[in-house]
């Protein structure tokens, strides 16, 4: 496949984001020298440099370790880039940090810029975009926010860098992406681009887009909008189907969803969408038909929670596989049988089906995926939180050496080793004393 048809995430970095105090990099690049499960790695060459990219990753860690914060940070960066500024918004995202940015800084830090860095491949270009935001302290609503630093690189060459001033190198941008006649009066163009730039606005989506390279910025924004799908709360997904001939009370059978649900073991004859009488929306519904009953019911009333959840998530999987891109989901596997998810993982590892090299990233508590026959060591990620500093740390199983007391050897039982705390990112939990105290007091647990 040509590079132009591939859209992949290479890495994502953060600093001073919620529980992540220090700079942390989440990598989707294959670890050097690691062998095995090569079918889950694909190669992309950009400007003569070969990149070995992972097609999946699973993230482990105890409750409150920061797993969701890592995924939430991807969502926040996406929202900021698409909005083009760092002002609060009332758009109602489930990720409150995307709406209320004073929730972002690590508690206890002062005057430390929050960092977001992302590196991805789109249309044969290696794109790296970095923003550092001065957001003040945690919950500081009155702080005058500003962009501390902003850098765009294409194929490892700096296109622009913004600090106190902005330096633009349009010679590092292919001519086809530049605005017409921009090179005829570059100094005047720079002055116009910088003069109207507010401190809380991104140069990328404002002056750089308007004055220098509209087509390049459109390409970047397209990746964030359509190729990076971050589901911060996967239990909240409600897919709405649009139809050109929408009629009230009409039932639209969805063959694909029905086939998927039958693999799951649904009780109804078919799944589809029924048009609401009150609005121009549709409701996922089950059709029940036998010799005694003929009815259409909302699927949430009739099917199991896990079935409805999987059916709502499945269109996202289809879209990623058909169009390419990166699908990131918080607790993707909750209420879904692990065998179903294992099949999805294997599909992302299958070049005959995953022809556009889509990527799947999710966090989980289910240890069944700690399997050397399912995931490579560099695809198994961990997040743990220090009990003293309350800061999160992220690492991969491939970061461990292959020898020594905590070494990870080929063919080992990853699940067993995880539960004996060989890899960290696990916490002993014992509610016995709390419950004994409550019971001994006759159930009175008032403080």
How does the language model describe each region?
Residues 2-76:
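Pre-Walker A-like glycine/lysine-rich segment at the N-terminus of P-loop NTPase domains
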Residues 6-11, 17, 343-447:
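C-terminal lobe/lid and adjacent interdomain/linker elements of RecA-like ASCE P-loop ATPase modules
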Residues 14, 118-124, 152-154, 287-292, ...:
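Short acidic, glycine-rich loop/turn motifs
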Residues 15, 231-302, 422-429, 433-447:
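Extended helical coiled-coil dimerization/tether regions that scaffold
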Residues 44, 50-58, 62, 72-135:
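Conserved P-loop NTP-binding catalytic core
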Residues 56-60, 276-318, 326-339:
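Conserved ABC ATPase signature
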Residues 101-166, 396-412:
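P-loop NTPase motor core
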Residues 128-272:
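Electropositive, glycine-dotted interaction segments
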């Amino acid at each position: 496949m040509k590079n132009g048809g591939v859209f992949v995430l290479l890495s994502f970095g953060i600093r001073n984001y919620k529980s992540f105090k220090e700079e942390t990099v989440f990598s989707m690049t294959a670890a050097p020298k690691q062998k095995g499960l090569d079918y889950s790695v694909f190669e992309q060459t950009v400007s003569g440099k070969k990149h070995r990219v992972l097609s999946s990753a699973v993230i482990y860690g105890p409750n409150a370790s920061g797993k969701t914060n890592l995924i939430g940070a991807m969502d926040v960066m996406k929202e900021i880039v698409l909005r083009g500024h760092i002002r609060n918004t009332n758009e109602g995202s489930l990720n409150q940090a995307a709406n209320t940015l004073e929730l972002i800084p690590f508690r206890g830090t002062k005057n430390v810029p929050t960092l977001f860095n992302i590196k991805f491949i789109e249309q044969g270009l290696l794109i790296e975009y970095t923003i550092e935001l001065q957001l003040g302290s945690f919950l500081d609503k009155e702080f005058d926010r500003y962009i501390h630093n902003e850098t765009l690189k294409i194929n490892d060459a700096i296109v622009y860098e913004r600090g106190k001033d902005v330096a633009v190198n349009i010679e590092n941008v292919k001519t086809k992406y530049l605005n017409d006649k921009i090179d005829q009066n570059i100094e005047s163009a720079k002055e116009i681009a910088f003069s109207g730039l507010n401190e809380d606005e991104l140069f990328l989506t404002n002056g750089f887009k308007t004055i220098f390279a509209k087509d390049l910025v459109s390409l970047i924004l397209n990746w964030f909008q359509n190729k990076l799908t971050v589901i911060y709360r996967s239990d909240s997904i409600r897919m709405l189907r649009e139809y050109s001939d929408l009629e009230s009370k009409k039932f639209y059978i969805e063959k694909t969803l029905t086939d998927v649900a039958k693999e799951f073991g649904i009780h109804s004859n078919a799944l589809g969408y029924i048009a609401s009488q009150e609005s121009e929306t549709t409701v996922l519904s089950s059709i029940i038909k036998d010799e005694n009953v003929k009815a259409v019911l909302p699927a949430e009333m009739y099917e199991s929670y896990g079935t409805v959840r999987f059916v709502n998530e499945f269109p996202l999987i289809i879209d990623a596989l058909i169009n390419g891109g990166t699908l990131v989901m918080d607790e993707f596997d909750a209420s879904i049988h692990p065998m179903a998810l294992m099949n999805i993982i294997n599909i992302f590892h299958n070049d005959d089906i995953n022809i556009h090299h889509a990527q799947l990233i999710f966090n989980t508590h289910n240890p069944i995926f700690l399997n050397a026959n399912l995931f490579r060591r560099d695809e198994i990620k961990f997040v743990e939180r220090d009990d003293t500093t309350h800061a999160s740390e992220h690492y991969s199983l491939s970061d461990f050496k292959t020898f020594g007391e905590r070494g990870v050897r080929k063919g080992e039982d990853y699940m067993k080793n995880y539960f004996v705390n060989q890899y960290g990112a696990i916490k002993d939990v014992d509610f016995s004393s709390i419950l004994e105290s409550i019971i001994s007091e006759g159930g009175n647990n008032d403080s």
